[in-house]
Design a protein with these regions (language model features):
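Glycine-rich phosphate-binding loop signature in dinucleotide/nucleotide-binding domains
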Residues: 18-24, 128-129, 175-180
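Short, flexible loop segments at boundaries between secondary-structure elements
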Residues: 111-115, 160-163, 199-214
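Acidic anion/phosphate-binding donor-loop and adjacent secondary structure
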Residues: 113-123
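Residue-level signal for inorganic ion chemistry
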Residues: 29, 73, 108, 138, ...
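A C-terminal functional module that forms or caps the active site or interfaces directly
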Residues: 142-177, 181-192
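Conserved beta-strand/loop subsegment of P-loop NTPase cores
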Residues: 43-46, 70-81, 96-112, 130, ...
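Short, conserved loop/helix-junction motifs that constitute active-site signature segments
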Residues: 37-38, 67-72, 98-101, 127-129, ...
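Phosphate/Mg2+-binding loops and adjacent switch elements
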Residues: 1-99
């Protein structure tokens, strides 16, 4: 697996094509509006809590284009769904989206691990029942994670998606944790573990469960 970061998608793709095998598959992240590159397969993600058909165009909402743009997608994935969704719940989304004949709809859920991990050790999540901890996340919507941990006692810091942690952020995190265990997402752990040299920093792994509904 090769990862290429480029401000210009065209230059990035040109580099990949010139330096890869002809049989390679190229996966572009966050590229639904990049019309300058023709894709063979377009996948649209929309969350269970905030589906695109209930949203509005920026700045009033979060959409970057008209809702009708979903018709360009080959596959639509409703993410962060409840595990074991009912047929009624699935039917609601299908009726709202009204997929074209050639579009496929999938439903995915997040399954959280029963363990928390860092570079030194793995602990059962039940260890978190013993004392309060600090939850730190820099993801688009931390509701799902906070809801999963709601039976535990914790304080939390919510940062924006793809947040680059500053020295000021780190000082706030360390001050608020006050020596307590710090729990974060696997994505944020990659950034924070470089900046916070503490054995008390852990992340909770996740798995994705897909259930197809066409």
């Amino acid at each position: 697996l090769r990862v290429v970061v480029a401000e210009s998608r065209i230059k990035g793709m040109d580099y990949m094509i010139k330096t890869s095998d002809t049989e390679s598959i190229y996966l572009l992240d966050d590229a639904f509006q990049h019309r300058s590159i023709f894709t063979g397969l377009s996948i649209l993600l929309t969350t269970y809590r905030n589906p695109f058909f209930k949203d509005f165009i920026l700045p009033y909402g979060n959409l970057r284009e008209n809702k009708k743009g979903y018709k360009r997608a080959n596959i639509i994935i409703v993410t962060k769904c409840p595990i074991n969704m009912s047929l009624d719940q699935k039917s609601y989304f299908i009726n709202k989206i009204k997929p074209k004949i050639d579009q496929k709809i999938f439903f995915s859920s997040i399954k959280y691990s029963d363990f928390i991990i860092n570079k030194n050790e793995t602990l059962p999540i039940k260890e978190l029942e013993k004392e309060e901890f600090l939850l730190v996340s820099g993801i688009a919507d931390s509701y799902h994670l906070r809801n999963h941990l709601k039976y535990l006692k914790f304080d939390y810091f919510d940062f924006s998606d793809h947040h680059n942690y500053s020295k000021n952020d780190l000082n706030k995190i360390l001050d608020k944790s006050n020596g307590k265990l710090i729990l974060t997402t696997e994505k944020d752990y990659v950034k924070l573990s470089v900046l916070i040299k503490s054995k008390s920093l852990f992340y909770i792994p996740i798995d994705f469960i897909f259930e197809k509904k066409e």
